[in-house]
Amino acid sequence: MVWKPLAHTAACLAGAFLLGGLIGFERQFRHRLAGLRTNTLVAVGAATFVVFSSLVSGDSSPTRVAAQIVSGIGFLGAGIIFKEGFNVRGLNTAATLWCSAAVGVLCGAGLISHAAVATVFIIAVNALLRPLVQVLEFQAMRRGAFQPTYAIDIICHGDAEAQVRALLLRDIGDHLHIHELESSNIEGTNRVEVSATVRADQRQDRLLEQIVGHLSLEPRITSARWRIEDDSGGLSGL
């Protein structure tokens, strides 16, 4: 009597191990944060919780356990997602972990064939759609959608830092995409340098000149200039 449920558990966990490993192998091959071991552990862990709910009598519905697994994976995925400037990285890796948990839930419920089908689709999304994304990005660049990067440097009195940042954000508005905004004290003075890196859908030299020209009229700003980041000979405004 003991061997039958034990064999069922072993089969479920083995399925989660193999399928989670397949998903993780693709991630490991591309050197992602969550690779072979992480995706395999997520799948096996999710399967274990579902198997446990089916073995214990009482108020332990597998569907309820699956809902709790989804919540738990959310916390794990949040640790992988991070911001780099104004860019968010790790979203695809976190989504893959979420899918690995779903595969584990299916395996834990004994639906290994269904889990195998889901695994095929998950790997296909990560592997086959990547070239399509690259083609779309290349086509966008050919259409002139390359985004030039501009740097704006402003020096102001220390007590005007917050005002300058607010004015800069207001003038940028929806015309440019902010990539980075930071402030630093200039040693030995009461001045602060506010630096911003922005991107545009196309060359916006005239707009940058207008923004910097408007800011230079502020009495608490002592210097304002802009330049094109990827062009050492780019224009600058005082």
Swiss-Prot record:
Membrane topology: Multi-pass membrane protein
Superkingdom of the source species: Bacteria
Subcellular location: Cell inner membrane
InterPro entries named in the record: MgtC-like_C, MgtC/SapB/SrpB/YhiD_fam, MgtC_SapB_SrpB_YhiD_N
Transmembrane segments annotated in the record for this chain: 5-25, 38-58, 66-86, 105-125
Recorded GO CC terms: plasma membrane
Pfam name, any one: MgtC_SapB_C
Keywords, in A-Z order: Cell inner membrane, Cell membrane, Membrane, Transmembrane, Transmembrane helix, Virulence
Function: Virulence factor required for growth in low Mg(2+) medium and for intramacrophage survival. May be involved in regulating membrane potential by activating Na(+)/K(+)-ATPase.
Family listed: Belongs to the MgtC/SapB family.
Name this polypeptide is given: Protein MgtC
Source organism: Brucella abortus (strain 2308)
